[in-house]
Every structure is written in C-alpha cells, then in structure tokens.
C-alpha cells in the first residue's frame, strides 16, 4: 500500500492553526489583514492607514455653528518579519498530519507565537493610563475595577474588553478572588486550571501570558517641574526640568499638577489627573529634558479632541510613576480595538521546492522549503509579516 504525502498547503494550514491556538494577547486584539500586497509582496516599512472616529463639539442655541471635520488618521507600519527555521525530510512527509504537527511543527510554532505576542505586548509603551501600585502584584478585584474605571472615563466601548497578565499577577488574582461571589463553573475553572477564565468583572477573559513585558524606568530622580507653559492645541511635546544626563525612558508615565483628564464625550473633568506616557527616550541636558514626546497630545476642553481640562503651566510639578531605574511588569487591560495587529502577504518565491501561503482570522502565514545542495539539507522557513 502506497503512502500519501503531506502537501505544502496541508502543512501551511496546520502551521497556521497551531500558531493561532498558541497566541494569547494577539488573539484578543484587533487583527487586520491587508491583501493589497498579495501580488508583489509586502516589505518591512510598508504602511496601513487607519481612520479614527470623528469628534465634534455640541453647541447650544438655534443658530447653526458649522465645524470643520476633525478626521484623524494613524499609521500602522509593517515593522517586523517573524520567521522560524525547521528541517523536515521527505520521509517525514509520509507521516500522518497530526503526528507531523506534534513532532515537527508544534515545538517551533509555539516559539513563533510567543515572539509575536511579545511584540504586541510591547505596545504598552504607547499606553498612557496606569492603575495599581508599581512593584505590587495585583491580588484583589480593585485593580481590575480601577482599570475598568479608566476605560469608562475614556468612553471606551464596554465590550469586548480583556485582561492579559503575567504569571505572578495571574497567581495573585486567582488566589485573591477565589470563591468571592463567583459562579460555580468559574470557581471550578480556577481550581482546575489555575486561571481566572472568562466573564470576570466585566472582562470577556483574563488570560495569562509569559510574553508580558517588563518596563525599566528612566534614571530620572529628584523633583521635576514644567519649564514652559503649554499654550498650543494639539501639542505633543513638553519641557521638563532635569538633572545632569539622567534619562526618561519610552513608556514612562507621569502626571502634571492641576492638569486633569476629561471625558471625551462630555469634555468635563473626570477628577483624576491626566496621565501621559513618554513615547521616545529623552536625556537631560543643561538642566532640562527638552521637547519630551508624549501621548496623548494636549487639547483643552475648548477643542473637539479634548484630553485635558487646562494647559500645563510653567513650574507645575511633574510626578513620574514608579521609582527610577526600576523594572515593573506591564499587565494589560484593554478593549479589543485598542491594539491592532496587522499582517500582510509575503511574496511567494518561484523555483523553490515547496511554497504556500494561507490566511485565516486576520493572520497571513507563509511556508517555503528549498534544497541546500551544498549541505544536503532541505531547510524550511515559516514567516509572518
């Protein structure tokens, strides 16, 4: 009886299935696929332009006040190409697909999934809202509810929202929340799996991931103040006093005295100081950090894109979150659309031994195998762009 050979399409579909099943953070974010590169192939540096929702001011009275469109766009850059190499022989192609997947694909694909998740987790550097106490592992419902509070004050859509935490936070939350008014099936999952599971405190899922990032804060120490009053709508830089050649790291979060966050729908103060995140590392020089790049951009309540109730004033105290030069885990609570993961088709090369590309649930994956005649090998690479 003749053996049937596994085809490259079968292998690619199975590899994509294994990849999806091993993703954690990436599975719960907005996944976009762009087929515009399907013919010529995408390259690192290619961009996708994403339109953000329009915002406008509500006016009172019978007189019409026409406003210009406040259309905003953000650019998503194809910034990395992930691949993993594997060798499989013609003899291994005679195996059953599940056996082949278990022996050849799963060990490598799981590492590819972890690397992709780590890239997505690195988006914390663009997130300006933070709750909890740096250095204290979450172990109560309060930190999850405070995270939900931040999302609500920012007018984020209620569902679907997710949390992805590191192993330490997962252990703390499962221990701290066990049996507290939880449905029987939730308690059962916690006991059997050691995971929080689904449908917890308004979150679709609370997942554990080993890809959650550790953030090392800048070396900034001592007191800091704003050096120059901000007066321009949409300004996304700020000047802060600094010492010597100390640093502020990308991902550092800070507040400014008397600058409060506003609800984007009502444009009224939430009563909480607006948090800002540094988007690019900055080194002090001449007693100041100059043009520190921040997010969100500063718009007052008079603007349709309002983020704060008033402009930061000169000499206002700046308070950084966490101690200087210290590592803190960056657990995430987010709405699905807060983070986008986009893939594009890689070019299918001609004249190789095997090549296939498959797309499923917003992920495009390519598998290529070629003969290495010099070393009598058949190297194969699995790529995601």
How should these model regions be labeled?
Residues 37-39, 148-154, 191-198, 227, ...:
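A generic local secondary-structure boundary/capping motif
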Residues 54, 167-169, 282:
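Short, flexible loop/turn elements at secondary-structure junctions
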Residues 1-74:
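N-terminal "assembly arms/tails" that initiate or stabilize quaternary assembly
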Residues 97-99, 239-244, 367-374:
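Exposed beta-sheet edge/beta-hairpin loop segments within beta-rich domains
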Residues 172-295:
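Autoprocessing Asn-cyclization modules and mimics
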Residues 50, 76-143, 152-169, 193-208, ...:
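Long, contiguous amphipathic alpha-helices that act as assembly "spine/axial" helices in icosahedral shell
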Residues 193, 210, 274-275, 279-385:
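Internal mixed-charge
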